[in-house]
C-alpha cells in the first residue's frame, strides 16, 4: 500500500483525496494545509493525520506526496521532497520560471524519485 501525504486541502486536494479512496493500492495517511480546519476536515475523511508539510516530507510513514498547494510553493516542496526520497505528484504548473522548473527536474533526477505533473 502506497502511503500518500496530501499537501494542500483545498479543492484540488479534496479531488485527489476522493481519487485515493477509490484505489486499493494507495491511501492518504497525512494532510497539511495553511488552514488548520481544512486540513482536519480532509484528514478526518481519510483517517489520516494532520501534519505540517515538513513533517509529512520527513516522515518515514509517507512514501509519496501530492502537491496541491499554491504554485509559488511548489519549487521548495519539490526540492525538499526529492531530497527526502519521496515520490512526487505535483499540480501544474510546477513553477512560473523555466529556470526553476529545470532546477526541480535536476533535483528529481539526482534523487532518482518518481515525479509526475498533473494536467487535466
Predicted feature residues:
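Rossmann-fold dehydrogenase core element
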Residues: 102-120
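Short helix-capping segments at alpha-helix termini
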Residues: 23-25, 84, 109-113
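Beta-loop-alpha module in the N-terminal Rossmann-like domain of NAD(P)-dependent dehydrogenases
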Residues: 48-107
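Glycine- and other small-residue-rich loops at beta-strand/loop junctions that grip anionic moieties
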Residues: 9, 67, 93, 118-119
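Short, Asp-centered acidic motifs that coordinate Mg2+ and/or phosphate
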Residues: 30, 63-64, 114
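N-terminal Rossmann-like dinucleotide-binding module
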Residues: 1-46
Amino acid at each position: 500500500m502506497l502511503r500518500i501525504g496530501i499537501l494542500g486541502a483545498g479543492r484540488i486536494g479534496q479531488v485527489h483525496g476522493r481519487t485515493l479512496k477509490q484505489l486499493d493500492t494507495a491511501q492518504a495517511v497525512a494532510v497539511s494545509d495553511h488552514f488548520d480546519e481544512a486540513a482536519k476536515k480532509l484528514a478526518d475523511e481519510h483517517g489520516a493525520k494532520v501534519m505540517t508539510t515538513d513533517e509529512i516530507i520527513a516522515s518515514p510513514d509517507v512514501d509519496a506526496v501530492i502537491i496541491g498547494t499554491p504554485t509559488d510553493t511548489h519549487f521548495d516542496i519539490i526540492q525538499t521532497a526529492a531530497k527526502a526520497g519521496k515520490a512526487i505528484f505535483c499540480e501544474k504548473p510546477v513553477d512560473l520560471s523555466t529556470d526553476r522548473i529545470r532546477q526541480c527536474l535536476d533535483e528529481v533526477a539526482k534523487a532518482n524519485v518518481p515525479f509526475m505533473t498533473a494536467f487535466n
